[in-house]
């Protein structure tokens, strides 16, 4: 029985640091509270997030010579940094690995920086493919 105690403790601690899957209305509320609706149409953004990450914070995708991270699928190609020494040169000033946890506060800050650029949602391929029209299903 004593040998199971360390495994039990690991099982209790690990879920607190693991990723989270959000629902569309939960995300809608969080994004609205953080003022993202002042920057971009939430149905368009939520559709793009769904088709990019499935609303999962742990999504990590290899995309040719860079990776995309987290619920917003933020690219290591200039937006976030894969190495600590590159953080200051990245637009969002964050390690990409920090975009994979269940706290999406820093993800939202980074996404807002990207969304305020002229290309806005066009930085995400899923937006052009799936989220330009018929967005009623993404309302809450």
Swiss-Prot record:
Residues 1-19 form the signal peptide. It is found in: Secreted. GO terms for biological process: defense response to Gram-negative bacterium; defense response to Gram-positive bacterium; lactose biosynthetic process. Keywords: Calcium, Disulfide bond, Lactose biosynthesis, Metal-binding, Milk protein, Secreted, Signal. GO terms for molecular function: calcium ion binding; lactose synthase activity; lysozyme activity. InterPro entries: Glyco_hydro_22, Glyco_hydro_22_CS, Lactalbumin, Lysozyme-like_dom_sf. Ca(2+) binds at residues 98, 101, 103, 106-107. It comes from the Eukaryota. Disulfide bonds join 25-140, 47-131, 80-96, 92-110. Transmembrane segments: none annotated. Its main location: secreted. Pfam families: Lys. GO terms for cellular component: extracellular region. SMART domains: LYZ1. PROSITE patterns: GLYCOSYL_HYDROL_F22_1 (PS00128), GLYCOSYL_HYDROL_F22_2 (PS51348). Gene3D superfamilies: 1.10.530.10. Residues 20-140 form the C-type lysozyme domain. Mammary gland specific. Secreted in milk. Belongs to the glycosyl hydrolase 22 family. Regulatory subunit of lactose synthase, changes the substrate specificity of galactosyltransferase in the mammary gland making glucose a good acceptor substrate for this enzyme. This enables LS to synthesize lactose, the major carbohydrate component of milk. In other tissues, galactosyltransferase transfers galactose onto the N-acetylglucosamine of the oligosaccharide chains in glycoproteins. Lactose synthase (LS) is a heterodimer of a catalytic component, beta1,4-galactosyltransferase (beta4Gal-T1) and a regulatory component, alpha-lactalbumin (LA). This is Alpha-lactalbumin. It comes from Trichosurus vulpecula (Brush-tailed possum).
């Amino acid at each position: 029985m004593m040998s199971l105690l360390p495994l039990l403790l690991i099982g209790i601690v690990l879920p607190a640091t693991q990723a989270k899957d959000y629902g569309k209305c939960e995300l809608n509320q969080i994004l609205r509270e953080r003022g993202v609706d002042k920057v971009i149409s939430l149905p368009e953004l939520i559709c793009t997030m769904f088709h990019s990450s499935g609303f999962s914070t742990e999504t990590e995708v290899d995309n040719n010579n860079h990776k995309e991270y987290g619920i917003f699928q933020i690219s290591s190609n200039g937006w976030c940094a894969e190495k600590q020494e590159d953080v200051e040169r990245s637009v969002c000033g964050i390690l990409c690995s920090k975009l994979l946890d269940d706290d999406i506060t820093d993800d939202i800050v980074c996404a807002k920086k990207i969304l305020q650029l002229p290309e806005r949602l066009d930085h995400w391929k899923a937006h052009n493919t799936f989220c330009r029209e018929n967005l009623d299903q993404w309302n809450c």
